[in-house]
């Protein structure tokens, strides 16, 4: 048995298996999903000491990292569709990363997996660091045997292996000794045969006389001389019987020690099997709990994740989409309510005392008082600009069709009715996109149609009542009563952010007869403009009209007309193509919720702004 096969376990257990070198550090530029506003941004990423950190750029590493995660329990997931993207998740924290190309992504994944495998959680290196021998005998406490060696926890098997090493040395020496003995015996036998042949050939030449005259052979003495060295103690002083007894005892000791080692290993195996069974059961329960947790987590969705927002490959279903939108709208409503309560204290409630109320005679429908300039002076019907024909067509269409009563039309559904306000909807879809026309009718006391339309059209007061706009600006002023406006709406996650580019025109349509009402109308419809190209937002298309008619109830006697005597009949029509990939059920539910809120909020704002002021007919 060669020495290089020694079972000596006195050295470190880590030497039983060659450990690989430390994992290679890595750094470079990766695109990281920051948030739903800025999207993917290049970041300097560093992989070092089982930690993944990122910086805004390579030049800003000295200012400290923007974030880091430990890879010990990280889960690395290559994206199913994007060949350059991979996600790293630790508990509920997720990093979304994109490489330059698939090969670049694979190199990063391999490096991260290498660091993770060396982290000490279930890796081969962690098993080596714990030590194979100690692990095998860690449960041997209390083992009872007839051997005189120590059977304390962590030492029994090691000491038995040391005993077997000693037995091996003894056995090797005994084998060498016995081999020498057998070799000597073989040599002696060979020499004996030669001597016997020689004696038989020459025995006649060596006769001796006996006193009685007989001749005898002298070979007895020579034979004694020949075989004197083959006695048990005659070859190199070796005690064959003693060596045989010792050899038998040594082999018996080896067998006993080996049997004891096997018993220890069997006991360890039983112990580890029980622990394995417990771990398997524990793992089963943990996996079941993990699946349940993941199911619950998916219901809540990862806020801001690129896979959990509106898009063709969105992982969020319609129910979860609606829940998320509704929750975001509720939060926004609370913020708007608190802001509106603060803003109301700053709204002027009355005009200076030098201004007087406008008066008019008793009539059923409003006519401008003589002291007021004619409406055509305020809003001309003969604007000259490049969209003039489109504006005229829109106004005529709305005056023809939008004022028609749809209450008895089976194609229109009454979706909301609150007091004087009624909201109708006609379901229309085109290529999977919801294009439902909505029509609302409302009656508001204390305001005129001119006042309502003026506040709806005037961009100077837009932010006072419009709470869904993030920012807007006038792209071009076509005429005193026609402008092109670009506005970006606040994003409601997980829906994509949307913008609108539209022409807004205000117009008064005089009454055709004395018994009819003058009508004020604001038309907003989508147009294109070079100064507002498409961007990261989803461009929505709109065709909206606010149509208002003023009714006046005659005051008693010769009293002046007050706001108690006026009432505004409002017809609001909206045709919106939202674009994008939002589910139809979500769009309809949001429209049903938001349109009535908008009308109530806007009309209340006009009432508060005009209260105590002169009437604008």
Curated annotation (Swiss-Prot):
Query: Which GO biological process annotations does it have?
Result: lipid transport
GO molecular-function term, one example from the UniProt record: lipid binding
> In this protein, which residues make up the domain named PH?
23-117
START domain spans which residues? 383-611
Q: Which InterPro entries match?
A: PH-like_dom_sf, PH_domain, STARD11_START, START-like_dom_sf, START_lipid-bd_dom, START_lipid_transfer
- Where does this protein have compositionally biased stretches of type Basic and acidic residues? 332-344
Would I find Cytoplasm among this entry's keywords?
yes
Q: Where is this region: Disordered?
A: 1-23, 332-355
Q: Which UniProt keywords apply?
A: Coiled coil, Cytoplasm, Endoplasmic reticulum, Golgi apparatus, Lipid transport, Transport
Coiled coil regions in record: 268-302
Instruction: List localization entries.
Output: Cytoplasm; Golgi apparatus; Endoplasmic reticulum
Pfam families assigned to the protein according to its UniProt record, in alphabetical order: PH, START
Where is composition skewed (Polar residues) in this entry?
Answer: 1-11
Residue positions annotated to bind an N-acylsphing-4-enine are: 466, 487, 524, 572
**Which positions does the motif FFAT occupy?**
320-326
Q: Which residues form the signal peptide?
A: none
Which Gene Ontology terms of cellular component type are present?
endoplasmic reticulum; Golgi apparatus
**Protein role:** May mediate the intracellular trafficking of ceramide in a non-vesicular manner.
Q: What PANTHER family does this protein's entry cite?
A: CERAMIDE TRANSFER PROTEIN, PHOSPHATIDYLCHOLINE TRANSFER PROTEIN
What does the entry note on its domains?
Answer: The START domain recognizes ceramide and mediates the intermembrane transfer of ceramide. The PH domain targets the Golgi apparatus.
Q: What is this protein called?
A: Ceramide transfer protein
- Which organism does this record belong to? Xenopus tropicalis (Western clawed frog)
